[in-house]
């Protein structure tokens, strides 16, 4: 057991993230739940969750080929999570506002016209860019984030515990599609080929390992397909 998880406000989520292979221990005894997440760490985890295998062009990032994160950055570029302008902040702690954008891009939860009025309750959202405002509004409206102390604290670095919490509020099940039998929860990320018949479910995300998907008489809150081999 990790010594710094017991009694933590996100204890259950942290254990689940570890069991699911989403988060790893910081060392043999700790998970460092209050430690900040860097941009490249966030992208690496999201690409792991979505089983991204394609590699984008990272020649403009000037990353040493032997850097541990070189392939993860290439996956992030391929998945549309990273752009050239992010090259200078890959190893910086990711602010909560930027993390909201990443989650929105990864799970495609930001609609064309989200209700921006939901941000009026937070005094620190008045000067957001359009992209930041849309991502924050979509997550607030969906009940994924609610702020702390009356504010969204968009400039504060996101912690590992917060990252796991937002992730599991978006989707709390990560399984092969062939094993899917319906799920009542926040959502499911499914990998591989799928044939789902006669189910009423929440949100479904098919990751980039899916290539053959058949849905018959399925009622879902939303269905997002990130596969590129259909």
Segments the model singles out, each with a brief description of its role:
Residues 136:
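Catalytic cores of secreted/periplasmic or lumenal enzymes
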Residues 1-11, 19, 24-97, 103-133, ...:
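Feature responds to low-complexity, polar/acidic, surface-exposed segments characteristic
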Residues 178-198, 202-230:
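Short, T/G/N/S-enriched strand-turn elements that build extracellular solenoid repeat scaffolds
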């Amino acid at each position: 057991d990790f010594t710094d998880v017991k009694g933590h406000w996100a204890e259950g989520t942290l254990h689940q993230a570890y069991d699911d292979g989403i988060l790893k221990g910081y060392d043999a005894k700790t998970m460092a739940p209050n430690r900040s997440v860097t941009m490249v760490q966030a992208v690496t985890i999201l690409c792991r969750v979505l089983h991204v295998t394609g590699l984008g062009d990272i020649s403009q990032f000037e990353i040493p080929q032997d850097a541990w994160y070189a392939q993860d950055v290439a996956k992030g570029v391929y998945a549309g999570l990273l752009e050239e302008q992010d090259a200078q902040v890959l190893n910086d702690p990711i602010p909560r506002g930027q993390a909201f954008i990443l989650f929105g891009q990864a799970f495609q939860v930001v609609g064309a016209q989200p209700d921006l009025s939901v941000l009026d309750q937070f005094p620190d959202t008045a000067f957001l860019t359009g992209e930041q405002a849309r991502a924050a509004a979509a997550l607030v409206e969906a009940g994924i984030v609610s702020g702390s102390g009356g504010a969204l604290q968009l400039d504060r670095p996101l912690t590992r515990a917060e990252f796991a919490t937002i992730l599991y509020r978006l989707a709390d099940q990560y399984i092969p599609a062939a094993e899917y039998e319906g799920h009542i929860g926040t959502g499911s990320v499914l990998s591989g080929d799928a044939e789902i018949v006669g189910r009423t479910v929440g949100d479904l995300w098919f990751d980039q390992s899916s290539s053959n998907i058949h849905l018959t008489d399925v009622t879902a809150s939303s269905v997002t397909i990130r596969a590129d081999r259909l």
